[in-house]
Amino acid sequence: MSERKLFTSESVSEGHPDKIADQISDAILDAILAEDPDAHVAAETAVYTGSVHIFGEVSTTAYVDINRVVRDTIAEIGYNNAEYGFAAESVGVHPSLIEQSPDIAQGVNESLEVRGTGDQDSLDLIGAGDQGLMFGFAIDETPEFMPLPVSLSHKLVKKLADLRKSGEISYLRPDAKSQVTVEYDENDQPVRVDTVVISTQHDPEATNDQIRHDVIEKVIKAVIPAEYLDEDTKFFINPTGRFVIGGPQGDSGLTGRKIIVDTYGGYSRHGGGAFSGKDATKVDRSASYAARYIAKNIVAAGLARKAEVQLAYAIGVANPVSVRVDTFGTATVAERKLESAVRDLFDLRPAGIIQMLDLKRPIYRQTAAYGHMGRTDVDLPWEKLDKVDALKAAVEA
């Protein structure tokens, strides 16, 4: 009998407490960047019953009405009812943002390369905002070059939100989670969905039978291709039996606690740094986007079935301390050729990444739910496939 393997990933909806925090942090970032594209921002958010706390460091010339940004974000997510224990116009909003540390700012504003040589190359000017390692990944098992388990998980909770907001399933509330287990064959190809778990917040009047029927028929079967579902696929719908209390009333939420949901669902490695609330001088965010951009173009070029790119930085230094490409034995050319092509074609200094991907724009709130990578519903620059031909030419040279 051929060997079959299972892999599981999860996602959470925009109404999950941690995702509320991420969206508030990125909404604040976007509001600041809209007025001051050169701002440095590190905005953290904590949410719990009836309260939102904003804290962190900002250097900017912009004035932003944080109170209004927070309330508008909460309202757009769908927390507009005091019964939920967390409502846009009644929550307490407590901002506590201070100026960025001058010790950090001096390394970001003037990199070690510039301080050491006096060189005025504009792309050498910005040093990395912190040390760290970042990963980007791509695989050919979905059209968006993402692992199937996390791709399906995102689409399930996004479908729940769409049905809630349209009123088609009127008893749904904003908080929800999904989890998908995919079975792979001996060649690491996905062959079926083994298990789907969905927990969705609901009004108290909704029955378990009604929720189960609607979620299976209107969500799961609408999202997951029929060829992946069979009579042995298991569905666990609200397995606790009741999910009325949810959102920040049920659990506190904090920016940066869903980093695996934000990326590849655990299918690829992660450097540990979160994204939301950070401007692009923070390589936790910008270098992760650059690494995804590189990996996706490598796979789309047919140079590997899957690719993982690692970048690493030292604080205050512009150039990465390391660049690695791992194709897990699937490459059609030597990995050293891929690494050489990456170094030649992609400027991986922070200022180079910012310029390459145009990251000073207010584009981040839309990434803060349903994944930062592999999105087909929004236009994100790190998802472009404009380096495919250049990569092919570089490895053939």
UniProtKB/Swiss-Prot annotation:
Its cofactor is Mg(2+); K(+). Residues 100-110 are annotated as: Flexible loop. SUPFAM superfamilies: S-adenosylmethionine synthetase. Transmembrane segments: none annotated. It is found in: Cytoplasm. ATP binds at H16, D175, A176, K177, R242, F243, D251, R257, K258, A274, K278. Belongs to the AdoMet synthase family. Homotetramer; dimer of dimers. This is S-adenosylmethionine synthase.
